[in-house]
């Protein structure tokens, strides 16, 4: 859970103001500016207001939050900022707004005039639904839902990807080798740009003096170039620090390259790397990585919930990933980043909203006031009929007077294992699932049987994070069997991306005939067997 109170600037707010925050971002050269969205979708800013970056219509700093009427009710989805700073955001409707520093046309309005208030970025984006934005020091990028990528602003090193070093005053589609490809994730270093395709391929362009493009050399690139060293890897997240890059594959493997003056690559040395190198090899599967173009800090979160940090951490150079006591990567930047900015738009939850939920959680499997027990594999789980009836339609029907179970104090369960059924009952009390991917398959079966659609989605999420070459076909089979279309497509893509390896596994040869034929036919349609 993100706690905005860990950022010093938010201590200026009253408890009531801080308690209303649902989204937030801290930015600026010294982390002296902040923007936040309240639970009723009002947008406020406060801080130094350097280069009009607060968007209040004037250049006055303020310790008291000011409302940005132009953005209230817009439902901000993605937000990024530059070094000027300038601010760029997109709404849930895909509309892009920008304001602040504009000395290099990074606001995309065709001028170099400061943007004193939020203004919609229209050129080439008016008919696009933008789903993600990213900012470098003085350039900007916007990713559309159809996979098209647009860039503009400062272009001294080719970071806009236009093929020249002339500044780009308005959004321009990044073409060349990306022309017919679909981009799904973007990131900016200070003067470099990175993109991930739906195929898992990675492309980079712009400044490369520290090897941050991962091309094996340090020559700048004026147009996108594929990171060939990641061939065979399917990357699903990429982030950039000031002059280094981190990439996370669909197998939970972490790669780093670029500048390493502060140990931000986590290799155990301070030598720059011109090509991607795997780090955290001995650690458990990584599920999230974090970096920010304003800092030389890196962070990662593993499947077990452990958060690591390395690089420049409060003046120290941490050259290997260091295990922290934080629960999220955002806390690393709040407490150890220099400056203490946000690496992404924060999503905030508050414990005071969980009073009832926490009470229910405490009573799960507590025999004191329970009125029902489930017996699975010789073990008991204590529950409350009222809670089960409220939370699950299956139990609501079961505990009607005409069901035998309504009169029982102990119900025997033999079609599901103890860990699976316990996780299900615990979910009814906590709305969360805590299971390894292997057991999540059984829980997916239960969720399908009990028509618990949200539980199915949670199981699919766990399974996706635990997919490997060895279990990919087993998970694909389970997804088909339990009619989990999203999971089926995810597993299918994973199998295609690692086709040679997964076809050598036992799970592949254990697939039943009809399903195997269906897989081969589908793989053939997407060109998996072309020479």
Curated annotation (Swiss-Prot):
In the retina, mainly expressed in the inner retina with strong signals reaching up to the outer plexiform layer (at protein level). Gene3D superfamilies: Potassium Channel Kv1.1, Chain A, Regulator of chromosome condensation 1/beta-lactamase-inhibitor protein II. CDD domains: BACK_RCBTB1, BTB_POZ_RCBTB1_CLLD7. The keyword Zinc does not apply. It holds the Pfam family BTB. GO terms for cellular component: nucleus. Keywords: Cell cycle, Chromatin regulator, Nucleus, Repeat, Transcription, Transcription regulation. It is found in: Nucleus. This is RCC1 and BTB domain-containing protein 1. One of its GO terms (biological process) is chromatin organization. It comes from the Eukaryota. The gene is Rcbtb1. The keyword Nucleus applies. Its main location: nucleus. InterPro entries: BTB/POZ_dom, RCBTB1_BTB_POZ, RCC1/BLIP-II, Reg_chr_condens, Signaling_Regulatory_Domain, SKP1/BTB/POZ_sf. Disulfide bonds: none annotated. Residues 370-437, 470-499 form the BTB domain. RCC1 repeats lie at residues 40-91, 93-145, 147-198, 199-250, 252-302, 304-356.
């Amino acid at each position: 859970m993100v706690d905005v109170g860990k950022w010093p600037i938010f201590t200026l707010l009253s408890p009531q103001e801080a308690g209303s925050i649902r989204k937030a971002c801290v930015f600026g050269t010294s982390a002296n500016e902040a923007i936040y969205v309240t639970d009723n979708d009002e947008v406020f800013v406060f801080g130094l207001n350097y280069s009009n970056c607060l968007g209040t219509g004037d250049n006055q700093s303020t310790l008291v939050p000011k409302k940005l009427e132009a953005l209230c009710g817009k439902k901000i989805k993605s937000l990024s900022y530059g070094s000027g700073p300038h601010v760029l955001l997109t709404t849930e409707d895909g509309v892009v707004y920008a304001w602040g520093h504009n000395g290099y046309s990074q606001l995309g309005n065709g001028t170099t005039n400061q943007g004193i208030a939020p203004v919609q970025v229209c050129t080439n984006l008016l008919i696009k639904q933008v789903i993600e934005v990213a900012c470098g020091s003085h350039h900007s990028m916007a990713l559309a839902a159809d996979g098209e990528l647009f860039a503009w602003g400062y272009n001294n090193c080719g970071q806009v990807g236009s093929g020249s070093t002339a500044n780009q005053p308005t959004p321009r589609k990044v073409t060349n080798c990306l022309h017919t490809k679909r981009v799904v994730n973007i990131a900016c270093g200070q003067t470099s740009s990175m993109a991930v395709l739906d195929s898992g391929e990675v492309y980079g362009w712009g400044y490369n003096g520290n090897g941050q493009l991962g091309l094996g050399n340090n020559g700048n690139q004026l147009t996108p170039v594929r990171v060939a060293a990641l061939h065979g890897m399917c990357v699903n997240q990429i982030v950039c620090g000031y002059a280094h890059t981190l990439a996370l594959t669909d197998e939970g493997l972490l790669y780093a390259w670029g500048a390493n003056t502060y140990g931000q690559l986590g290799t155990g040395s301070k030598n720059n790397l011109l090509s991607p190198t795997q780090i955290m090899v001995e650690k458990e599967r990584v599920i999230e990585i974090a970096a920010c173009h304003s800092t030389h800090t890196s962070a990662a979160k593993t499947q077990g919930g452990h958060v690591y940090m390395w690089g420049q951490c409060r003046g120290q150079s941490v050259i290997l990933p260091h295990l922290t006591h934080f629960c999220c990567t955002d806390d690393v930047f709040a407490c150890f980043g220099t400056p203490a900015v946000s690496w992404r738009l924060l999503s905030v939850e508050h414990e005071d909203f969980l009073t009832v939920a926490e009470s229910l959680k405490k009573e799960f499997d507590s025999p004191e006031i329970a009125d029902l027990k489930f017996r699975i594999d010789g073990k008991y789980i204590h529950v409350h009929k009222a809670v089960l009836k409220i939370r699950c339609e299956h139990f609501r029907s079961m505990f009607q007077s005409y069901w035998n179970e309504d009169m029982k104090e102990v119900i025997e369960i033999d079609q599901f294992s103890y860990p699976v059924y316990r996780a299900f009952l615990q979910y009814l009390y906590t709305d969360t699932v805590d299971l390894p991917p292997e057991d999540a398959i059984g829980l997916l079966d239960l969720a399908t049987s009990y028509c618990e659609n949200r539980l199915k989605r949670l199981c699919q999420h766990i399974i996706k994070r635990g997919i490997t070459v060895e279990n990919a076909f087993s998970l694909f089979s389970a997804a088909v069997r339990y009619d989990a279309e999203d999971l089926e497509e995810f597993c299918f893509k994973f199998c295609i991306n690692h086709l040679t390896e997964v076809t050598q596994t036992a799970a592949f040869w254990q697939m039943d005939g009809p399903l195997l034929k269906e897989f081969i036919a589908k793989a053939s349609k997407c060109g998996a067997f072309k020479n």
